[in-house]
From Swiss-Prot:
Mg(2+) binds at residues 242, 287, 314. (2R)-2-phosphoglycerate binds at residues 163, 339, 368-369, 390. One of its GO terms (biological process) is glycolytic process. PANTHER family: ENOLASE. Belongs to the enolase family. The lineage of its organism: Bacteria, Bacillati, Bacillota, Bacilli, Bacillales. The gene is eno. It holds the Pfam family Enolase_C. SMART domains: Enolase_C, Enolase_N. Binds a second Mg(2+) ion via substrate during catalysis. This is Enolase. Pathway: Carbohydrate degradation; glycolysis; pyruvate from D-glyceraldehyde 3-phosphate: step 4/5.
């Protein structure tokens, strides 16, 4: 039978060596699910709360034993006897058990671990792949990878202000070829950086983290690497950026302090800069181009670039339907970044994706900078036919685990698998 008979959480480590929550769920019939919870470095002000212990003598205050105990002592007794396939009812129970707007009582890291482990146990009970359980028979779209190959900002110890510079192999015929193209460009970039005497150590998300003369130089260097790898920038491969601009926004003067370049810009000047970069380079996506509370700036950016560039809200929307609804109403952005730990349950995550699609917004399924070997987001990307996934460079097992899972899914789907490439950006004038 599909009834839950045991729930157990433990403290494990993520890709940065920080503690995180792992949850296991068992059913009466032997169904089993395990989930590991990711963690972000640049976090949005309105994200659900990630509960940390605060004991400075243990993991520098970053322990998660409180969240683990919340699963084992509070959530587990309430879950026992539930039908594991009742995902919506279970998520509703978890939300009500916490009782706060931001999941600050039990912790989003505790709640999410349970939510995903339940889904995995249900898929195991039914003996079907996770993506099929989550999305049904119509789960067939492999995502275009958004591969972060130059790291800056909070993800690297260098002088680059923009947090992520990414490549998107939109000209590939399928996911397998897209991954090959991305990997070859990644290796090409390493040789380009080496030839310039630049650092080829990698950052949190597997991308290179060199000191560069400017943010624009990162774009120039990536274009050079694409060409050196034998591909055509703008035709076969597009560029994307995650500015994570809340990290260099100064609340006191309301301006953007690009310390790597020694430049201070207003919102309008930031929009001018993005417009200039889009005119020079094949950029198809910009994430968090302005501060999460700079709604007027985001509106201006959308007015200027929204018809030809995907404008993704991460800190802006935090996978939250209330924040997304506000953005839709105000004509801000045209895409949402989906991070399961920003909101805390699978049900709320899927609600945000559905709202985005109804409004003509795209959805980008995303990892966090502190990741694990858990590959759930790969299944979510296919389950929702989102068409895009952002999960780092083809480097470090915590990133590659997601890409390898997508390769497996593409094999399982065989001739029914779809890869939409440039058509993924259905709401742009391409």
């Amino acid at each position: 039978m599909p009834y839950i008979v045991d729930v157990y959480a433990r403290e494990v480590l993520d890709s940065r060596g920080n503690p995180t929550v792992e949850v296991e769920v068992y059913t009466e019939s032997g169904g089993f699910g395990r989930a590991l919870v990711p963690s972000g470095a640049s976090t949005g002000e309105y994200e659900a709360v990630e509960l940390r212990d605060g004991d400075k003598d243990r993991y520098l205050g970053k322990g998660v034993l409180t969240a683990v105990n919340n699963v084992n002592e509070i959530i587990a007794p309430e879950l026992l006897g539930f039908d594991v396939t009742e995902q919506v009812a279970i998520d509703k129970m978890l939300i009500e058990l916490d009782g706060t707007e931001n999941k600050g009582k039990l912790g989003a890291n505790a709640i999410l671990g349970v939510s995903i482990a339940v889904a995995r146990a249900a898929a195991d009970f039914l003996q079907i792949p996770l993506y099929q359980y989550l999305g049904g028979f119509n789960s067939k779209t492999l995502p275009v990878p958004m591969m972060n190959i130059v790291n800056g900002g909070e993800h690297a110890d260098n002088n680059v202000d923009i947090q992520e510079f990414m490549i998107m192999p939109v000209g590939a015929p399928n996911f397998r070829e897209a991954l090959r193209m991305g990997a070859q460009i990644f290796h090409s970039l390493k040789s380009v950086l080496s030839a310039k005497g630049l650092n080829t150590a990698v950052g949190d998300e597997g991308g290179f983290a060199p000191n560069l003369g400017s943010n624009e130089e990162a774009l120039q260097t990536i274009v050079e690497a694409i060409e050196k790898a034998g591909f055509k920038p703008g035709e076969e491969v597009k560029l994307a950026m995650d500015a994570a601009s809340s990290e260099f926004y100064n609340k006191e003067d309301g301006k953007y302090h690009l310390s790597g370049e020694g430049v201070v810009k207003t919102s309008a000047e930031m929009v001018d800069w993005y417009e200039d970069m889009v005119s020079k380079y094949p950029i198809i996506s910009i994430e968090d181009g302005l501060d999460e509370n700079d709604w007027e700036g985001h509106k201006l950016l959308t007015e200027r670039l929204g018809s030809k560039v995907q404008l993704v809200g991460d800190d802006l929307f935090v996978t939250n339907t209330k924040k997304l609804s506000e953005g839709i109403k105000n004509g801000v952005g045209n895409s949402i970044l989906i991070k399961v730990n920003q909101i805390g349950t699978l049900t709320e995550t899927f609600d945000a994706i559905e709202m985005a699609k109804r409004a003509g917004y795209t959805a980008v399924i995303s990892h966090r900078s502190g990741e694990t070997e858990d590959s759930t987001i790969a299944d979510i990307a296919v389950a929702t036919n989102a068409g895009q996934i952002k999960t780092g460079a083809p480097s470090r097992t915590d990133r590659v685990a997601k890409y390898n899972q997508l390769l497996r899914i593409e094999d399982q789907l065989a001739e029914t698998a779809q890869y939409h490439g440039i058509e993924t950006f259905y709401n742009l004038n391409k």
